[in-house]
Amino acid sequence: VSKNISITSEELNSTDMISIVSSFPSNFINHRSPGIPNELRRKILHQQYKNRIVSDGLETGHLQLTDNGYIFKSKQSFSSFAGFVFEAYLVDEFNSKRTARLRAFQWATERSEGWSTKTFDEYKAVGTGLLSTKTNYLGYYEPQSNADIIFLRKSPLLDIMEPALIYNQQVSAKIQVKSIKNRFKEDIVDKVISGKYLRVITMLSDNFGRPSWVICHNILHHMLRTNAITSDVYANTIGRIQGPEYFDLNQYYIDDYYDYIYQWYNGNESSTKHTDEAAEQEITGYKYVNNVLVPIDA
């Protein structure tokens, strides 16, 4: 007969207990459980995202190589920094996962189901604020523009790169990436309605765990019901705001990654620890493969 074994909060938070539990693979532990100690949660997030932040940090230019190894430098606000990191994350995901890139390309170029994908594989996702773009496609490097992600291919007629266009229009297909937890109407909905942003991927859930794209859609529903917008504006806007799951990306993974970025940005993750792990895991050995930053041994 099994017996319940009680454990106090103090015992659960003890160094020994954290060490014991931390020896298990991090994906075996639900770090979202309210009973998980903060220190253990930080360790789990660190284990899951340490390589990801190095890759994205190098790409955005916020992680720099010095005589003392890799260190984090940024004069930007946290929200701006997180935005650049998620821009790098999405570009990486789109270029490494054809299904996600195809969905994003179809959405951004406003193509209907059943369109020919014959030329699609010629295009790659490009982040307008990323270092690889500055190095390889300087003319498309615009870190302050209203487009975080575009799609480029080599022109079949000229030896130049050209952007994907919205179907039957001479307008570049553009995606804005938002990594915010509030002010969704002012910073997303209103700007899509006004035309400042063509399309937005809003990455995060709010502080209550509600996906921000759902909140944006609810805002549009309310605006329609109260006659703040017409049915035409509603129909034209709602499909232009999507979240990660629209592209088969995991919302929980992204929210957890955001938490890890936050604790690292605010100094809860030691730069020395990252430097040591970079040496141990040969994170210094990154290279560009099809303009995606990957480990050399990948």
Predicted regions and their residues:
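Non-catalytic C-terminal interaction segments of nucleic acid-processing enzymes
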Residues: 1-19, 27, 231-298
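Generic surface-pattern signal
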Residues: 54, 99, 193-194
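Nuclease-adjacent, charged terminal/linker segments that flank catalytic cores
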Residues: 1-66, 298
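Catalytic cores of nucleic-acid endonucleases
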Residues: 84, 141-142, 167-247
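Generic structural signal of hydrophobic/aromatic residues within well-ordered alpha-helices
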Residues: 40-41, 188, 261
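Catalytic centers of nucleases
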Residues: 62-66, 72-190
